Amino acid sequence: MAVISLLFLAVMYVVHHPLMVSDRMDLDTLARSRQLEKRMSEEMRQLEIEFEERSRAAEEKQKAENFWRGDTSNDQLVLGKKDMRWPFQASGQDGGPLGWMLGNLWNAGLFCLFLIFELLRQNMQHEPAFESSSEEEEEEIRVVPVSSYTWLSGFPSQEALESFYKHYIQNAIRDLPCTCEFVESFVDDLIEACRVLSRREAHPQLEDCLGIGAAFEKWGTLHETQKFDVLVPIVPPQGTMFILEMRDPTLGRRCGCVKVDSECVCKNEKLLGDVLCLVHHRDHSAMLSKCTSSIKAALCTSSHLDVYKTVQWFRNMVSNAWALVAHKYDFKLTLPPSTTTCKLRLDYRSGRSLSISLVLGVQREDTLVYLVSQAPEREQFTSVDWPESFAACEHLFLKLVGRFAPDNTCHLKCLQIILSLQDHQTLPPGASRPILTSYHFKTALMHLLLRLPLTDWQHRMLSQRLQDLLWFLGRSLQQRSLHHFLIGNTHLPLTIPIPKAFRNAEPVNLFQHLVLNPVAHSQAVEEFHNLLAQVKTLPCSPLAGGL
C-alpha cells in the first residue's frame, strides 16, 4: 500500500504539472499546454469524485452484508472498537502504538513531499499569459467604486458608438491594410537597390524594414494614416562592430551612443593551437584600419556614429537607388529635407500623395529595442545621441493580442474613436500644443489589455471597454502617474524580447512632467474633460471639419 500511494502521488503530480522545457516556449505550444492542463485537471477531478462515490457505496454494501451475516468484527461503529493498526499495515499484522506512530509519520512525510513539489511548481511558472492577471489588478480595474464613474454618466450606447465608427472611421481606413503592404514592399525594393550600390563600400549594411506606428498597428485614424513610419535597422560591415554606450536614464533621457570599432573573431573566440588571425596579421591590418577609418571619417564624430551624417548618407543612397527602380512605379518621388529621418513623398497622377519616414535603428543585443535616429517630439538630443525606441516591441505585443484575441474585438476601435475626437479638439486658450498625445492613450490601452482577459474585449463590449479606457486615463491624470508599458512591467509576457534589466527596473512615469508643471497638468485635465464632453455628445454632434 505504501508503494501504491507513493506511485499515485507521483502520477498525479506528473499529470497535473508537466515539466517545463524552457522559459521561452513558443506561443502555440504554450496555449496548447494550458488547454491540456485545464482539461486534464477537470477530468482528474471528475474521476476522483466517481472513485470516492464508488468506494463509499462498496463499503456500505460490505458493511450491510457483514451485518446480516452476523459478522461485526470489522464494524467499528457497532463494536465501539478502534483500529490501532498502521494504516498501510497488512490486516494480519499488529504494530501496536509504534506502528500507529510510524503510520502518522508516513502520512506526514507524504504530505510534506507533495507540498514541496507544489511550491516548486508555482515558483517555476514565470510566464504571464494575456488572459491572466493578478486578483488585485483585476479588482482594481473591474470593481470600481460607483463614485469613480459618476463623471462617465450619460455615456453613449453601443449602437451610437458603432454608428460613429462606421460613418467616420471605417470608411476612412478601408484601404489602409493594402497601403501598408505596398509601403513595406516599396521600401524593401529601395533597400535592395541600396545593397546593390553599397556592395563595394565599407559602409553600414541595411536590413529588412519593419513598419511601425499607428498605420501598421491598425489603430490609426485619418490623421494618423497620412504618414507611415518604417524602421530600417543598420548593422556594421564585416570587420567593424557597433558598441552601444547607454546614457544614465536617471538623467531624464533614454538614449545612447553608438561607438564604431574594429572587430575580429579572435577577440571573442579562443583559437586552438598556433593559428594565424588574418585580420590582425600585419598584412591585413592596413585593410581593417582603412575600413574602420572610412566609416569614422564619413559617418562619425569622435568615433561615435553621428545621427545627422548617417541620415544624410542614407538619403543619398536612397536617391541613387530610386534611379534603379523608378521604372517600376507610376508616381513621382521626392525627398523633403530632414536631419533625423529620410522622408519620402510619393505623388500620384491622380493627386493622391503618401508620406513615408524611414527611421534608422541600431538593435540592442537580441531584443526588439532599438536606438533610432528620430528623436521624440519636444525633446532635443546631440548629434551622437540615438534615442531609445520601443516601437517594435509594442508592435509585436499588439500583433500577439490580435492573434490570441477572439474575432472582431473592440480594443482598437476604442483607441480609434478617442483619437478621432481628439484630432478635432480645440486647444484650451493659451495652449500651443496638446499635452495628451496618442501615445498616452495607447499606453493606457496596452495596460488594460494585460489586466483584463481578452474575452472581455468582444465586439458587444465596446461601450464598457471605452469607459474603462477613459476611466484608466482619468485616474492616471488625477494621480499624475502613467507608467511606461515596457519598463518595470513585471506582468509583460516573456515572448516580448526586451533587455532583462527592464523587467525589474523601476517603472517610468510618463506623467512626470505633470508633477513638475502644475500649469501643464491643468491643461491636460481640461483636454480630458473636453474629450469626455465630445464623447457624451457623440450621437448628435458631427465632427468639426468632417472626416
From Swiss-Prot:
Specify the protein's topology with respect to the membrane. Single-pass type I membrane protein
Cite the ranges annotated as topological domain Extracellular.
17-96
Where's it mainly located?
membrane
Which Gene Ontology MF annotations are present?
A: receptor ligand activity
> What is the role of this chain?
Functions as a ligand of CD3E, inhibiting TCR-CD3 complex signaling to regulate T cell activation. Induces stable CD3E-NCK1 binding, thereby preventing the CD3E-ZAP70 interaction and subsequently inhibiting the activation of the downstream ERK-NFkB signaling cascade and calcium influx.
| Similarity comment: family membership | Belongs to the ITPRIP family.
Q: What is this protein called?
A: Inositol 1,4,5-trisphosphate receptor-interacting protein-like 1
